[in-house]
Amino acid sequence: MKLALLILLLLNPHLSSSKNTPASGQPQEDLVEQKCLLKNYTHHSCDKVFCQPWQKCIEGTCACKLPYQCPKAGTPVCATNGRGYPTYCHLKSFECLHPEIKFSNNGTCTAEEKFNVSLIYGSTDTEGIVQVKLVDQDEKMFICKNSWSTVEANVACFDLGFPLGVRDIQGRFNIPVNHKINSTECLHVRCQGVETSLAECTFTKKSSKAPHGLAGVVCYTQDADFPTSQSFQCVNGKRIPQEKACDGVNDCGDQSDELCCKGCRGQAFLCKSGVCIPNQRKCNGEVDCITGEDESGCEEDKKNKIHKGLARSDQGGETEIETEETEMLTPDMDTERKRIKSLLPKLSCGVKRNTHIRRKRVVGGKPAEMGDYPWQVAIKDGDRITCGGIYIGGCWILTAAHCVRPSRYRNYQVWTSLLDWLKPNSQLAVQGVSRVVVHEKYNGATYQNDIALVEMKKHPGKKECELINSVPACVPWSPYLFQPNDRCIISGWGREKDNQKVYSLRWGEVDLIGNCSRFYPGRYYEKEMQCAGTSDGSIDACKGDSGGPLVCKDVNNVTYVWGIVSWGENCGKPEFPGVYTRVASYFDWISYYVGRPLVSQYNV
């Protein structure tokens, strides 16, 4: 029966989406990955999320860019301090550094025109029905309840000076009986959740005159009373009901309730990186998962939506496509944010055109063809090729620290586009070496920090290295881009398990393995090392493969150098998987030497 169910799931993967919903009787907290929570991830953690266009990733945290680092193209905007800025990005960058200054409106500033949000009919200043005064409107207006969600409520509370966001969007407010409110004249609002002011959200007015109900909010304060045993502790100190964690909604206000998930509640979408996002963000034209799968296979999804006449609702479900006439009252600043994002520099990479620890060694692999692994290089020391390496762009090669010594850099050559030692091909290029950088904390006894950089010499009169037939592999910035059981590829000229020499470049597929302490107790360091192999040991790296690549492809077939062949024992034995240097742990170290623009993508 279990086998039949497994076959059914494999034939119809859509059935497996039910994993996002907790099974009956399953404890709600089981959806939260406790080990991940210890890292205190928030919406500013670039291991889990993309930074905004006015931010950059520094040591795992989205930090403020300086305004001059923003793209120059754009329309002027006005801030709450009455000062104009050349673009939305310039203002958001300034706000990032000075949070008290917020967006007011598009265009130039005028003394009398200011956006305003307020609450009325509440018992305290933390709650009430929401009113807004748009810049070009004469009167304050209410917001329609049917366009109001936790997303918009969070932004309203941020705007009102409550940094922990919303506590509830339901409330009993004290509307005097003699106050007649016309709920047919309310405004509709749509936010994305990245805004800090409601002024950045899009306001519209519908032609319908039916009553809508009015949006209200109760903002969160530190004295909110949530039972500790039945609540989720957000990184910012806020507490929310446990059942609201991993539901695709940013209830914490800092997104910490959605970044450490093993599954998602309701219709939320689970990224491979353990992040839950609202279902309506799937196939919306913008990548939200750092692993990219929310924008994969979207053509079929769009066809189905059009065929069914459905659109995504604010709550992540589906609703009929609206035909009601809508008047847009404010510019769509989210479209402007996406436009700014599109202007950021693009990176082209990853797409083809002796002790008891033995230095590692591809066993059981297949011969490679020209162009299969254009990032693979060989490092020649004197008259013999001793190690592999990975081209990562510019003049830089990534390899293992145990392969090279800084003092011997003049002895090394980098061979690119090499397929066979014995039959040099016409595409083969030989580069001299100008510098070797070994990680300062490399430990030759334990193989910790077994990583090094080799800088190739530039040809006379050239500003850059020109490797015509080479393509750089992308450098991963997050440890969550790939997961245990993902299938990846190793390549090299290492010996076979019978110690027979190999002269042609060979490759093989291996699976990433989780914590390998059970195979190498006391010698495996999870943060710095990655295990990979096959269940029968038929594919492995072997002596001579050291320094070479363990590469993995994402859903868009972009190749990342996930590991560097480092060490292991007993070539080709299933109980002794290969151990690789985990490259994602060294992104900042690599970028320090090679320059961030060479390896940075997605605004990292």
Swiss-Prot record:
UniProt keyword tRNA processing, yes or no: no
Residue sites binding Ca(2+) 2 per the record: N284, E286, D288, D294, E295
Signal peptide: 1-18
Binding-site list for Ca(2+) 1: K244, D247, V249, D251, D257, E258
Glycosylation sites: N40, N106, N116, N182, N515, N557
Subunit text: Heterodimer of a light and heavy chains; disulfide-linked. The fully processed and mature protein circulates as a zymogen, and is allosterically activated by substrate-induced remodeling of the active site. Interacts with C3b. Interacts with complement factor H.
Protein name per the record: Complement factor I
Organism: Rattus norvegicus (Rat)
